[in-house]
Design a protein with these regions (language model features):
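N-terminal auxiliary segments of SAM/dcSAM-dependent transferases
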Residues: 1-65
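A short alpha-helix capping/helix-coil boundary motif
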Residues: 4-5, 73, 94, 121
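Conserved short-loop catalytic and cofactor-binding motifs
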Residues: 13, 41, 78-81, 107, ...
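Conserved alpha-helix/loop element of class I SAM-dependent methyltransferases that forms part
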Residues: 27, 31-37, 49, 70-74, ...
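Conserved nucleotide-cofactor-binding alpha/beta core module
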Residues: 96-130
């Protein structure tokens, strides 16, 4: 379901497995941010970034065969030699962009559309092209 520029899943689409896996994924992203802080300079990600990751249903952007891995902290194939990026990388890229609600973002390489969906509630407009 698309609501206000953000792809969201209705409550019925969020299975118990998805919710539990998402909670684990968000913990893992926070741990990864902390453990890579000396390299990246980002020991934690903004609450706003983490909240968007919590709301955007990654399982909507992966194939039926990969539903069980939708909230694994790893890239997944989406066909045509492309992948949906690792969630930590999506969070990191979003964090370092340091966007706000006045920004217009042009994304080159839409892929699954997940990164654009993550950016959408944080900025004024996202334009994306494959």
């Amino acid at each position: 379901m698309k609501k206000g520029g953000l792809v969201t899943a209705s409550a019925s689409e969020w299975t118990t497995h998805h919710k539990e896996a998402l909670a684990g994924l968000l913990r893992e992203i926070a741990e990864d941010a902390h453990s890579t802080a000396k390299l990246t300079g980002y020991p934690v990600f903004d609450d706003e970034v983490m909240e968007v990751l919590r709301k955007v249903p990654r399982h909507v952007f992966v194939s039926d065969q990969d539903q069980g891995l939708a909230y694994a902290n790893r890239p997944l194939g989406i066909g045509h030699g492309q992948t949906i990026s690792q969630p930590y990388i999506v969070a990191f890229m979003t964090e370092i962009l340091d966007v706000n609600s006045t920004y217009k973002v042009l994304e080159i390489g839409t892929g699954s559309g997940y990164q654009a969906a993550v950016l959408s509630p944080l900025v004024k407009h996202v334009y994306t092209i494959e």
